[in-house]
Amino acid sequence: MTEQLNTNQQNDEAQFMIQRIYIKDLSYETPNTPAVFQQQWEPELKLDLNTTTTQLDKNVYEVVLTVTATVMNQKTTAFLVEVKQAGIFTIQGAAASQLDHLLHSFCPSILFPYAREAITSQVIRGSFPQLVLAPINFDALYMQQLEEKQKATGAKDETVSH
């Protein structure tokens, strides 16, 4: 009886599976070579992140994490690398709020190490010093985004009520 109860509890939980992880797009530009190689190396990194999701089928989603790294050296662009790291995920039995969290926080957390490796590899192939991107707390970014949405919704509600 206990085993049957545990099985039923497990079936009520959300199920998550990675089907595939792949690079959807990769771009690398070095607009100021070879002059940038002659400069003292004092890099300044600008990092941009974006996540998009698409439902492919019932319970099947594509999540694309776009990471753009622009490195400036002495006010000129040394290089720009952009990777669209994608994954196809099966998610079953998740409540709407849980699904949103999985798609916009958990899945990007899975994809980021792959994107980081692709960026590092391209930078090294371009003969620049290794670019090591720090880990990103996608849970914190997700919570910040939720708070911003709630504030925006609250501000709209206040405007309407006055």
From Swiss-Prot:
Keywords noted in UniProt: Chaperone, Cytoplasm, Protein transport, Translocation, Transport
A GO cellular-component term linked to this record: cytoplasm
Q: Please name one Pfam family that this protein belongs to.
A: SecB
Subcellular locations according to the entry: Cytoplasm
Keyword Transport in record: yes
Write down the superkingdom of origin. Answer: Bacteria
Supply the Gene3D superfamilies for this chain: SecB-like
**GO terms for biological process?**
protein folding; protein tetramerization; protein transport
User: Which terms does the record give in the GO molecular function aspect?
Assistant: unfolded protein binding
Q: How does it assemble?
A: Homotetramer, a dimer of dimers. One homotetramer interacts with 1 SecA dimer.
Q: Which HAMAP family match?
A: SecB (MF_00821)
Q: What does this protein do?
A: One of the proteins required for the normal export of preproteins out of the cell cytoplasm. It is a molecular chaperone that binds to a subset of precursor proteins, maintaining them in a translocation-competent state. It also specifically binds to its receptor SecA.
Q: Which family does it belong to?
A: Belongs to the SecB family.
Q: What is this protein called?
A: Protein-export protein SecB
Give the species: Legionella pneumophila subsp. pneumophila (strain Philadelphia 1 / ATCC 33152 / DSM 7513)
Which gene is transcribed and translated to give this protein? secB
